[in-house]
């Protein structure tokens, strides 16, 4: 759990430093210490994932599944599963859980990476090559995934 909690602590620190921009979150983390951030990360990663979203469009989710599992070779987009895991559970400390993520939130984050608003060299490069239709498909698939 320690490594998994580090991902959330890292994101909270990014909000506090201004590296990640969101006025609501920046206000919430302004007075947090690094130890507070670690504790919050540990708390959230101790929670069992709930089925928070569902895929609403089976055809779109099917296209998204192909992208998630195999990528898009002609656009040099790797499979999401390579980093985030086949079941979307994430990989401790480095890659967040994607399974069951709300499509609207996930799409906003992919677009933020594509525009450079959110900084992560790997995700910036990948999303810059994605078409919006690819993003819509993959977030639809992720919504229907259930992390184990």
Stretches found by the model and what they are:
Residues 9-10, 69-81, 93-108:
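Sequence context surrounding c-type heme c attachment/ligation sites in exported
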Residues 6, 27, 35-38, 89, ...:
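Surface-exposed, polar/charged faces of alpha-helical domains
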Residues 5-61, 65-66:
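Extracytoplasmic c-type cytochrome modules immediately beyond a signal peptide or single-pass transmembrane anchor
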Residues 57-89:
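Sequence/structural segment immediately N-terminal to covalent heme-attachment motifs in c-type
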Residues 16, 84, 114, 143-146:
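Protein kinase-like catalytic domain
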Residues 6-7, 13, 17-23, 56, ...:
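Extended intrinsically disordered, low-complexity coil regions enriched in Ser, Thr, Gly, Ala
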Residues 30-52, 63, 104, 109, ...:
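C-terminal capping alpha-helices of c-type cytochrome domains
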């Amino acid at each position: 759990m320690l490594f998994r909690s580090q991902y959330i602590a890292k994101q909270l620190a990014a909000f506090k430093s201004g590296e990640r921009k969101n006025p609501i979150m920046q206000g919430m983390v302004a007075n947090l210490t690094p130890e507070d951030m670690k504790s919050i990360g540990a708390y959230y990663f101790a929670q069992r994932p709930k089925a928070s979203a569902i895929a609403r469009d089976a055809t779109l989710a099917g296209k998204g599944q192909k992208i998630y599992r195999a990528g898009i070779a002609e656009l040099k987009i790797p499979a999401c599963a390579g980093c985030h895991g086949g079941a979307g559970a994430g990989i401790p400390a480095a890659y967040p859980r994607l399974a069951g993520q709300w499509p609207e939130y996930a799409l906003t984050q992919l677009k933020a990476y594509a525009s450079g608003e959110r900084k992560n060299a790997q995700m910036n490069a990948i999303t810059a090559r994605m078409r919006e239709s690819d993003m819509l498909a993959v977030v639809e698939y992720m919504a229907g995934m259930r992390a184990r």
